[in-house]
Amino acid sequence: MRSAHFHTTDNGLSLLHATSIFPATNNKYWGRMFVWFDTMPTAPMWAHWSIVGAVGSGNDTEVRLGGQYDGSKNRFGVGTDHGPTGDWTNLDEDPGNPVPVDSWVCVEWLHDGGADETRFFWDGVEHPSLHTTATDHGGPQSQQYVLPDFEDVFVGWWLYQPGTTPGQFDVWIDEVALDDSRIGCSL
């Protein structure tokens, strides 16, 4: 068995897409994967990256799971681009530890379009600071965070800013699972 290896230079992207699981019952699905980061960006300030994203119809919101360099460390984060709430990322505050490098980490997520809710788990532990709802999110509070009717989910590595330090990234992803209920980290 081999892991999927994603190699990028600077602000590159390397992704695998899954569409066959959609439409999901009640527009809700759980995901789980194991991720190994060889390094994380340390420049530019606020370098922003994704390892999971989902899009669909109904609106142009792209739901993201990834993280951001805050000037001292990379932290996991959830957020979006496009859609009525715009581009935002909530960073992990539980307790806000850096994303581990050179070790496997189990990442789990919920995208519930029926309830307009997302959740994030790291090594089996939920991080409530990364829980979003239609009215509790990182965008303008005057706008509801409405999730799309999911049609496509990607996993991989996507770094958005150019001029990164270091100049290349290697990420390995293994044991990706998508289901209508929580999967967990046990293999």
Task: Please annotate each region the language model reported.
Residues 33, 107, 171-181:
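Extracellular beta-strand elements of beta-rich domains used
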Residues 12-27, 93-96:
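Short surface loop/edge beta-strand patches of beta-sandwich-type extracellular domains
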Residues 131-171:
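Flexible glycan-contacting loops in extracellular carbohydrate-active proteins
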Residues 47-82:
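Glycan-recognition/cleft segments
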Residues 80-106:
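Short, aromatic/His-centered strand-loop micro-motif at the edge of beta-sheets
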Residues 103-119:
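Localized edge beta-strand/strand-to-loop motifs within extracellular or lumenal beta-rich domains
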Residues 23-39:
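A carbohydrate-recognition surface predominantly in extracellular/luminal proteins
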Residues 1-15, 74-78:
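Short carbohydrate-recognition loop motifs
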